UniProtKB/Swiss-Prot annotation:
InterPro entries: DapB_C, DapB_N, DapB_N_CS, DHDPR_bac, NAD(P)-bd_dom_sf. Its main location: cytoplasm. (S)-2,3,4,5-tetrahydrodipicolinate binds at residues 157, 166-167. It comes from Syntrophomonas wolfei subsp. wolfei (strain DSM 2245B / Goettingen). PROSITE patterns: DAPB (PS01298). Pfam families: DapB_C (PF05173), DapB_N (PF01113). Gene3D superfamilies: Dihydrodipicolinate Reductase, domain 2, NAD(P)-binding Rossmann-like Domain. CDD domains: DHDPR_N. Its EC number is 1.17.1.8. This is 4-hydroxy-tetrahydrodipicolinate reductase.
Length: 266
């Protein structure tokens, strides 16, 4: 019988964390061995996610959990301030990482990439675990060959800490890598209110919306002479991310380097 991969989840009290606990607990090839959250007070995971038979209590010290449980994989859904140190601690002791937390900067990603190579363990940084979102990014990248003028609108729940989203950044990067030219700027354009034209990543404007009731949504809008093209993805429930989370956990165990974007594991 194939040995189950031993997994711990950091950020277990968050909305994505709770869904991830359920998904791992329900998968025959994965074993949930610990759950971590800085706000934890010893809660029972079984009570938290409504699955009986899990004898696991929430803990609040990730370094202790890594040392005591020696997992195969750390799944991180914490926050931009914690994720880098969490991943670095795990990689240093040979623990594979799946990072769903956005907010890592280029320097931090390079350091994690170097550490993964030194330790020969895989680390996956995934801006979006929804298969539909990955397809949206791929379609947008293809469309950019023919429609170089493009803007992105990303919409998320009002508790999301960072802007723009990792998905929007990744989409803009893929567009810039694939479009043959970048349109000239409108030099006469000016903002009556600072920031109203959005952020600019390689001449792709990104607009961030934060409202209660939303989960994760993105539109990529292309314009051309006499026509337009809109590519949109909507996540209506966090359960829609879970097939991707489970797949990435299993796939990253076969890698020995940093992987950025789920499309590179499909």
């Amino acid at each position: 019988m194939k040995q189950k991969a031993r997994v711990i989840v950091a950020g277990a009290l968050g909305k994505m964390g709770k869904e991830t606990l359920k998904a791992i607990a329900g998968d025959e090839e994965l074993e949930l061995i610990a759950a971590v959250d800085i706000k934890a007070k010893g809660e029972k995971v079984a009570d938290l996610i409504g699955i009986a038979g899990l004898d696991i209590s929430l803990e609040n010290d990730l370094d202790e959990v890594l040392e005591n449980y020696q997992p195969d994989v750390l799944v991180d859904f914490t926050n931009p301030q914690a994720v880098f140190n969490n991943a670095r601690s795990a990689l240093k002791i040979g623990v594979f990482c799946v990072i769903g937390t956005t907010g890592l900067n280029e320097i931090e990603i390079k350091e994690l990439e170097k550490l993964a190579g030194e330790k020969q363990v895989g680390v996956a940084i995934i801006p979006n675990f929804a298969i539909g979102a990955v397809l949206m990014m791929k379609f947008a990248s293809e469309a950019a060959k023919y429609f170089p003028e493009v803007e992105i609108i990303e919409l998320h729940h009002d508790q999301k800490m960072d802007a723009p989203s990792g998905t929007a950044i990744k989409t803009a990067e893929m567009i810039n890598a694939n479009r043959p030219l970048r349109p000239p700027r409108n030099v006469r354009e000016f903002e009556k209110i600072a920031g109203c034209r959005g952020g600019d990543l390689g001449q792709v404007r990104i607009h961030s919306v934060r409202l209660p009731g939303l989960i994760a949504h993105q539109e990529v809008i292309f314009g051309g002479a006499g026509q337009g093209l809109k590519i949109r993805h909507d996540s209506f429930d966090r359960a829609g991310f879970m097939p991707g989370v489970v797949m990435v956990i299993k796939k990253i165990l076969q890698r020995k380097e940093l992987v950025y974007g789920m499309e590179n594991l499909l």
